[in-house]
């Protein structure tokens, strides 16, 4: 089934060209089914790129999805045109009386700051608390995952000696988890971060389950049943060229920046990278949506009440 997004969103033409089924708003209202309402709180600098990445993964599932783009209320995006934000994004304070089957919160370029120094941290804490009463399933990515386990479980983040950048092997630890249905025993996904949270800091009484980790880069995916959340510490949603784009940006200001590990063939940045994580990205999002669909109430107003 297709994903329902605004007709004029730049992602529409990109996804249609890739063969992703995109449903126009006028067509969606003619289908006599309730679509899954999923919100995307997009904290990444390039909003258009990230919204396209997430919409691509949501749109590949067999259920109709209605995507709502959300921004922090008072934070001004500096790398995305103001007219795009005005046309397609809702401030969180304007949607926090609504209910969502699913809610995705992205990474953010603030991970080297203490959480309390992030300008929108107070609102971020309110968002996390709001998900417990207004959202059925939440997926936190990279910085948002670190922020969520800090908020809910008091888990600190630690600076890494150098940026972890590349495509790293991961181990599936709980293949019986519905979120890992179809996963290989090991697989590779992109990592791009300066900080980490540690398995040794998981509180014994937290209910957190480590689903995926890496001997090189540590925690990858945590299941948080008590908060109906998944915490993905890496960037499974990245495009083929995302790490390359970051690398070429970084060397403009830091010429000694290292080439992403296991990414360019032969570690030669002049050669085009290959995507080795696409299938697992689709599996994760598909499994997450399936679990959401199986358990969310048909009457969306009952979310948070049952």
UniProtKB/Swiss-Prot annotation:
GO cellular component: cytoplasm
The entry's keywords: Acyltransferase, Amino-acid biosynthesis, Cytoplasm, Methionine biosynthesis, Transferase
Broad class of the protein's primary localization: cytoplasm
CDD domains, per the entry: GATase1_HTS
Subcellular location: Cytoplasm
EC numbers for this chain: 2.3.1.31
Active site: 142 (acyl-thioester intermediate), 235 (proton acceptor), 237
GO MF assignments: homoserine O-acetyltransferase activity; homoserine O-succinyltransferase activity
Sites marked Important for substrate specificity: 192
Pfam families (UniProt xref): HTS
Binding positions for substrate per the UniProt entry: 163, 192, 249
InterPro entries associated with the record: Class_I_gatase-like (IPR029062), HST_MetA (IPR005697), MetA_family (IPR033752)
GO process annotations (BP): L-methionine biosynthetic process from homoserine via O-succinyl-L-homoserine and cystathionine
Pathway participation: Amino-acid biosynthesis; L-methionine biosynthesis via de novo pathway; O-acetyl-L-homoserine from L-homoserine: step 1/1
Annotated site (Important for acyl-CoA specificity): 111
Catalysed reaction equations from the record: L-homoserine + acetyl-CoA = O-acetyl-L-homoserine + CoA
Family that this chain belongs to: Belongs to the MetA family.
NCBIfam families in UniProt: metA
Cited function: Transfers an acetyl group from acetyl-CoA to L-homoserine, forming acetyl-L-homoserine.
Protein's name according to its UniProt entry: Homoserine O-acetyltransferase
């Amino acid at each position: 089934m297709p994903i329902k997004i605004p007709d004029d969103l730049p992602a529409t033409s990109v996804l249609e060209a890739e063969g992703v089924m995109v449903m126009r708003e006028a067509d969606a209202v003619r289908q006599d089914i309730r679509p899954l309402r999923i919100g995307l709180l997009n904290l990444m600098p390039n909003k258009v790129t990230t919204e396209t990445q997430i919409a691509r993964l949501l749109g590949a599932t067999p259920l109709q999805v209605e995507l709502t783009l959300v921004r922090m209320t008072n934070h001004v995006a500096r790398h995305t045109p103001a007219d795009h934000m005005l046309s397609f994004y809702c401030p969180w304070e304007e949607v926090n009386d609504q209910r969502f089957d699913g809610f995705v919160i992205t990474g953010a370029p603030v991970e080297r700051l203490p959480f309390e120094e992030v300008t929108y941290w107070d609102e971020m804490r309110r968002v996390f608390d709001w998900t417990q009463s207004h959202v059925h399933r939440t997926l936190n990515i990279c910085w948002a995952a670190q922020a969520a386990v800090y908020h809910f479980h008091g888990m600190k983040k630690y600076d890494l000696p150098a940026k972890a950048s590349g495509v790293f092997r991961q181990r599936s630890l709980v293949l019986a988890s519905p979120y890992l249905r179809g996963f290989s025993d090991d697989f590779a996904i992109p990592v791009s971060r300066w900080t980490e949270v540690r398995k040794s800091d998981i509180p014994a009484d937290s209910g957190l389950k480590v689903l995926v980790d890496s001997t090189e880069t540590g925690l990858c995916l945590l299941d948080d049943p008590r908060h109906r959340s998944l915490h993905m510490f890496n960037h499974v949603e990245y495009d083929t060229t995302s790490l390359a784009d970051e690398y070429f940006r970084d060397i403009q200001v830091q010429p000694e920046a290292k080439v992403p590990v296991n990414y360019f063939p032969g570690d030669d940045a002049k050669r085009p990278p290959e995507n080795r994580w696409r299938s697992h990205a689709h599996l994760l999002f598909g499994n997450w949506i399936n679990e959401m669909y199986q358990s969310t109430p048909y009457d969306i107003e009952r979310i948070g009440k049952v």
